């Protein structure tokens, strides 16, 4: 049995993951409007990943006989004036999500909820990867994105990124 505190935090996390998808849709749209289809694709894949994260949290709650409470998703309010703005905002957001996952994990630990801790282990690892990917995007943009050829090459590379469902999601079907 999960504690009310853990259930509430996991429900909150479902909504934060859905907000993440919504935020990355905004970034995808921004790059599409700038005719940078590769950068748009990179964020399109992020949308799919964040949606999968929400689905995993939802499934965990449902598998443990708890209802999922979906909240309204706020409109992203991040000024996007420079090509690097979504990249920087994306890293900051991933760092925020990492803090949220750690809060869920800490609550599960306090409650001696080892099953939830084991479930969240995947998210802890995933957030490390998400932060590294976001940081690498910024680094590569700073190195190569300030001239037309470099930006063109980065954009072409990011067009090839594809979504791969998390293995723990693939086993749910």
Question: Can you name each region flagged by the protein language model?
Answer:
Residues 1-173:
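Iron-associated oxidoreductase/ferritin-like identity signal
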């Amino acid at each position: 049995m999960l504690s009310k505190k853990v259930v509430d935090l996991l429900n909150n996390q479902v909504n934060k993951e859905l907000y993440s998808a919504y935020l990355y849709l905004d970034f995808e749209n921004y790059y599409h409007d700038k005719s940078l289809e590769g950068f748009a694709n990179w964020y399109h894949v992020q949308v799919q990943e964040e949606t999968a994260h929400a689905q995993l949290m939802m499934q965990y709650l449902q598998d443990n006989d708890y209802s999922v409470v979906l909240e309204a998703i706020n409109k992203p309010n991040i000024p996007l004036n420079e090509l690097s703005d979504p990249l920087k905002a994306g890293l900051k957001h991933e760092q925020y999500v990492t803090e949220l996952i750690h809060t869920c994990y800490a609550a599960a630990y306090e409650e001696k909820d080892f099953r939830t801790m084991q479930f969240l282990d995947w998210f802890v690892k995933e957030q490390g990867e998400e932060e590294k990917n976001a940081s690498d995007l910024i680094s590569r943009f700073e190195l190569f994105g300030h001239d037309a050829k470099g930006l063109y090459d980065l954009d072409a590379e990011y067009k090839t990124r594809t979504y791969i469902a998390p293995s723990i999601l693939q086993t749910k079907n």
